[in-house]
Amino acid sequence: MTRTIVESKTKTAIIGFDQPFCVIGERINPTGRKILAEELERGDFSRVEADAIAQVAAGANILDVNSGAVFSNKMAEDPRYADNNFVEPMLMPEMIKRVQAVTDCPICIDSSVPGALENGLAACEGRPLLNSVTGEEERLELGLPLVKKYNVPVVAISNDDTGISEDPDVRFAVAKKIVERAADFGIPAYDIVVDPLVMPIGAMATAGHQVFTLVRRLREELGVNTTCGASNISFGLPNRHGINNAFLPMAMGAGMTSAIMNPVALPVSPAKVAEKRAELAALGLVLPEDMDDEALVQLFGMGSTLPRPGKEMEAIRAANFLFDRDPHGGDWIKFNKVAPKAGQEGRGRAGRTGGRRRG
């Protein structure tokens, strides 16, 4: 069985055909997150640490750390801060150190900048996953020597110098090329995790079918583990969670062994809570004085004010159970166990009083 080993200093994550689905948490990424990028520019890593903790609590097995930021406020003093090749090699090791300080979860180092990858590898304790190489000649020549030097597994993305092909046969050929080139460096297939590239189903009706077919071929013909950006499948569609929740178990059934995704259901913001309170007040509804924000959002099905596992995690855990990758359903039962209410700890059926006894 193909098994890809990713390790922190004290913990091991296994990506494999016979293993529970591996969730690679994607939240630590300043791309498209303006507030996080601004905080990183100020040297504030508190959100990075909070995201790491929340994702592990939600069930992430590996944490992706992406350093893709530019420091716009510092550009005036030094134009190099507008260049990822300048910023990321400095930023990546600090982000990794902060994550390692608050969790022992294995890390996936995510950057397209070779200097950031190498500095991240130097800062990482254990055996991280490197994200990524592509079929582009320049990326292969820069990335594969790092993989060999540090003896780490790598994500191989199925695009090359011609871009991303909509033809699944072309994407398979690119993946095969990467596996073969890696072998030339002495890198085994079990240390390569192929991303066959998930297309948005809203733009390409065959996107789901393509991925399932590709994953089967990659497993059967190349013997490699696979991953994907799970939320890509639902991009641009309403109720994205509904699509994601169906896609992930189907991908698992086809043989996909991991996904880069957000395991956390984002908390309801204070602004949303205030909006709901105002809406109820306008309707003349009077809430109990002692009803806090969490009780309010639970009552009206808004979610939670606290980070918690997302619905996608529920779908993955159910699929692990159904595919016999969760022995005796232990993880499923633990995940769905309801915490006892205050004052009821230790009370079970035998603790009830006043019931009729059978003679």
Task: Describe the function of each predicted region.
Residues 1-193, 199-359:
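Domain-level signal for soluble alpha/beta catalytic cores
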